[in-house]
C-alpha cells in the first residue's frame, strides 16, 4: 500500500498516535482493527462467493466499502499494513481447538510479527474467544485484553491456552514459520465452498466492543455491554439490511430470491 492508502486504512480503524516498533503499538493496531472492522461471512453465505485475497481487492472491500471479512481476508490485509508500517510480518497456518470436539484441520490464518527483537502472534480475523491483542511467542502466562493466556513453545509448534473458571482451555497452535500467500488460496477455497463450511451455511457477523460485543448468528442479534444482554430477531431481508447498517456499518443488498 502507498502512504495515502496506509493513512486511509488507519483512518478506517480510528488509529492515531505514534507508530513505534514495539509490542504495545502492535497491540493498539490490533485493537483498533477488531473494534472497527467486523468479522463476517456475508459474501460466502449470501452470495456463495469465494473471497478474493488480492490486497487491492481487500483494500476496496474493507477500507473503501467499509465491509469486513473472515480470517484469510482480515489477516491478509492486516499483514500488508504491518509490513508497510515497518513490522516484518508473515502469515502462518493455525489449528483452532475446541474442548471435546474432534481435531480440526489447519484452516485458520494468523500472523507473526517482529518487534523489539521478539516474535508476536497477531490475529484480527478470529471471531471466537481468541486473544484480542498481541501474544508474545514465549513460555508463560500473559494478560491480553483482560484475559489470561498461556503460551508453550513445543518441539514443533506454539500452543496458546486461555484461562477460564474451569481451568486452562487449549485455544490454538501453530508453527511460527512463514507460509507463502499462494498456499492460503486452497484453504480459502475450501473454507468458502466445502458443503459443511460453517461460513457458507451460517450468516455470521461479529464485532468486538470495549466492554462487550455485537454478534449476528443467522437471524439472531445479540448485543453484550458489561452485564447487559440485549437480543432480537430479524424477520425480513429489509430488517436485516437495516440491522447490518445500523449495528455494523455494513451496507449490502440481501438477495430476495433465497429463502430467508
Predicted region positions:
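Secondary-structure boundary elements
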Residues: 1-66
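Residues at alpha-helix termini
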Residues: 12, 84, 246-247
